[in-house]
Structures are given as C-alpha cells and as structure tokens.
Amino acid sequence: MRIDPSTLNLKEKVVHINRVAKVVKGGRNFRFSVLVVVGDEAGHVGVGTGKSIEIPEAIRKAIEDAKKNIVEVKTVGTTVPHDIIGKFGKGEVLIMTAKEGTGVIAGGPVRAVLELAGLKDVRAKSKGSNNPTNMVNATIDGLARLRTVEDIAKLRGKTVEEILG
C-alpha cells in the first residue's frame, strides 16, 4: 500500500552529499550524489537518492525519489513498540525503546531518520557498515517492520488482553 505524499506535510533533510567521478579520455567528469530523508514527524518517513552535475538538482531528484519510498512507522507514545534490528547490506541498526524524556540517542544519519519519523524518545546503535546509505536504509527497514500489540492481536485473531496475558 503506497502512501500519498501530497497529503502529508513533509520536511526534508540532506543526510549525505558525495562527489563522484567518471574517468574519461579527456579527464574526469564530476557529478554529485545526494542522500535525502523526508518525513512528516508524525509516523511517516522515506529515503531517496539523486544524482546530477549540480547539487540543487541532485537534491530535488533525491526528494522526489524519497517521496516515492515513504513507509509508515508504528509508535507507542513517543517511542517504538519494541526493540528491532534493521538490516541493509552489511549495515545493522539496533533500534531500542526508551523512557519518556530520554530524547533521540542516535549517531549521524540514523538520527535524521528517527527525528523525521516523529520519534521523540528512542535509542539506536549502528553496527557493521558505516556507510550513510546502508545506515539510513537499515533504519528504514527496522522502522517498517515494527508492529504494535494491536497489529499482532489482529493477525492472530485474538484480543489485546489475550496477547498481553
């Protein structure tokens, strides 16, 4: 089920800008590759990449791409319903629940994703790959796989009370 980005009040954040080169006979052709995260700070977040000769054009393309890849994030109050490990390539991000007032404890690119997803109290630890693309996509993977107690009860055909015991 795709989420329509036009109905959301999206904010965007440039996570990483990389200058890439194509070596040709006459020298090097430089381009810019940009990684952007978009989110409404209310449970929707997406990531996209864009490439162009000029940075503003690359950012525009990345934002367009990110709007096509928006996922819904399940939350319980200001945190995540349970701990989860998101994986992408060799990058792993462990997203953990936190008490109210903790804030967002996460490094670099992961922090941007969690803040734009609307999470206020959450901890994250990244393992493996330090590549911003892998870290951001691993975070998105983890957030997309989150489930609330209500979701699990519905899947099993039981009530929430039966699940919680």
Curated annotation (Swiss-Prot):
User: Mind telling me which GO cellular component terms the entry cites?
Assistant: cytosolic small ribosomal subunit
Name the Pfam families for this protein.
Answer: Ribosomal_S5 (PF00333), Ribosomal_S5_C (PF03719)
Instruction: Please list the GO terms describing molecular function.
Output: rRNA binding; structural constituent of ribosome
Keywords from UniProt, A to Z, are: Ribonucleoprotein, Ribosomal protein, RNA-binding, rRNA-binding
List, alphabetically, the InterPro entries matched.
Ribosomal_Su5_D2-typ_SF (IPR020568), Ribosomal_uS5 (IPR000851), Ribosomal_uS5_bac-type (IPR005712), Ribosomal_uS5_C (IPR005324), Ribosomal_uS5_N (IPR013810), Ribosomal_uS5_N_CS (IPR018192), Ribsml_uS5_D2-typ_fold_subgr (IPR014721)
Q: What PROSITE patterns does the record point to?
A: RIBOSOMAL_S5, S5_DSRBD
Swiss-Prot/TrEMBL GO biological process terms: translation
S5 DRBM domain residues: 10-73
Oligomeric state and interaction partners are given as: Part of the 30S ribosomal subunit. Contacts proteins S4 and S8.
UniProt free text on domains = The N-terminal domain interacts with the head of the 30S subunit; the C-terminal domain interacts with the body and contacts protein S4. The interaction surface between S4 and S5 is involved in control of translational fidelity.
The free-text function statement in the UniProt record for this protein reads:
With S4 and S12 plays an important role in translational accuracy. Located at the back of the 30S subunit body where it stabilizes the conformation of the head with respect to the body.
NCBIfam families (UniProt xref): rpsE_bact (TIGR01021)
Protein family membership: Belongs to the universal ribosomal protein uS5 family.
Record's protein name: Small ribosomal subunit protein uS5
